[in-house]
Each structure stands twice: as structure tokens, then as C-alpha cells.
Amino acid sequence: MLAALPAISGYLQTGYEWSDNSSSFFIKRVRLSLSGNIAPKLDYRVQIEFASPKIVDAYLCYRPFDELNLQLGEYKLPFSIENTEYVPLRYEFIEYPLSLCKLMGFNDLCGLSATGRDMGAQLFGGFFRRDGYSILNYNIGVFNGEGLNVRDKNKSKDVVARLTLKPAAGLQLAGSYYWGEYGADYLKRVRYGAGACYDRGPVVVRGEYICGTTGDLDSEGWYAVAGWRVTKTLLPAVRYDTFLENSARSSSRQTNYTAALTWQPVKYLRCQLNYTYEDYAARDVSGNNVVALMLSGIF
């Protein structure tokens, strides 16, 4: 009977941020998750965000074969490496890169603020198993395109596809595609992404390029991350992160340079310190220094 009960987990992320323009304490995330198995090949998950109350995950997943699985509900879109592989408790930085935020539903140019999630269905799987992972992996799905807990505002469905190659343990190469129309006016929303990641042992190296069209606006950006696990509890990392909101205007570029330190002395506590310099190409916008400290309590 106990095996049928859901596993309960969660975390709280809170901290303080100072910049040239402001300073504030903040609560970034407060999440509670319930997950379990309904049957041997059928699992579920429900995750609730309390910082700004909403359901962020609610899905059923049927896993009959390694090569073919079905997921239905609300969950992370299978686009980019960071969106699905680097959840907040694994991520080396406090903030995600600009290109992911602006083009994949975090603080999207189309108006969505959905933490890279949507409601829909996807097929996914992997081929050529070796040492606990599949060398060739795919995801293909259809989604509302409206974000969290929102019914579709048009009759069109958005299509997302990703192909991931893992030639060796810790190494992955991924390409992603998103096509959609959002809102009652069927405005164009197209995204392309390509990236590579090596994360094994002490080494963390990762980079992605993401571009897209939102209505009539073309945008693009990319980031590069490098980190080194000095010990099992200490990880320093740096990131170069640049984004052109309007690809035709160089003055729309923002570039962030971030140095980060993550320290996790025990399983249930994670401490992060970030320094970011925000550089703006626009002549009338000054650069900005940002220092942020965030603590994660995990249960």
C-alpha cells in the first residue's frame, strides 16, 4: 500500500539582489511536487508553484518501450538543452540566459511567462542503448502555445521537435524546432535552436544558439557556459550571454557577463552567489552591475 502513495518533494528559493539601480529581497520559487506510478509503465507528476500560485507540472506519462513513450498534460517544452535538462536545483546560475527567456516562454517576446512550459502531448524515446543512456533521442509534440493553465485562444496547434545525439557519456548535441501561431490573431511564433553540452566529472561546458520570429520581429541570441567542480560541494562557473531582440538593429543587443559560485554543503541546502555585468548596445542605456545571493532549502 505504501508503494502506491505519491512521493512528496519540494524546495524554497529565496535571496537578495543588489544592482546599480535597485536592491531587494526576493522569493524566486516555492514548489511542492507529488509523483508516483499508477501502473508499472504509467507514471504521473503534479508540481505547484506557491510564489506566484499556479500549477507548473501536471501530466501522465506512459512508457511502454525505450523507443516510444507518450506524455500528456502540462510540462516543459522539449526545446533546448537547458530548458529540460537543467532544472533550478541543478542549474549553475540564478537566472537563465536571455535567449531562452525571451524565445522559449520564460519572459517571451510574445507575452508569455510560462517557465518554458505548455499544455499538450508528445511522443519521445531513444535508440541504441549503451551504459544507461540512448545514443539517439527524439521528442515531437503538439501544444496549445498559450502557456500555463490556459486554453488555446485559436484553432491552431503549435508543433515542437527536438533531436538529441549522445555519442559518449556526458556529451550531447541537440537541435530544436518550434512552429506556432499565438493569440486570436494567429501571430507567427517560430523558434530554432542548436546546442552542445559536456557535463561529466568535474567539467561543465555548454553552449546554445537560439533564434526566432515573433510576429514580424526576428531575434537571436546565444550563450556559452564553463564550470569546474572543485569538490563535490563547490562549483564555480562563468557565462557569456548575448541577445539581439531585433536582429536588424545592433543597438537592440544586450550582453550579460556572469560569474557564479554554487556551494551545497549538505543535501538539503544550496547556496548561490552571482555577479553579472549587463552591457547594452543602445547609447542611451548605461551598463548595470548586479550581485545576487540565493539560498535553496530542499526537502
Predicted segments, located by residue:
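Outer-membrane beta-barrel pore domains
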Residues: W18-N21, A39, R45, C61-R63, ...
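A generic structural motif
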Residues: E146-L148, T213
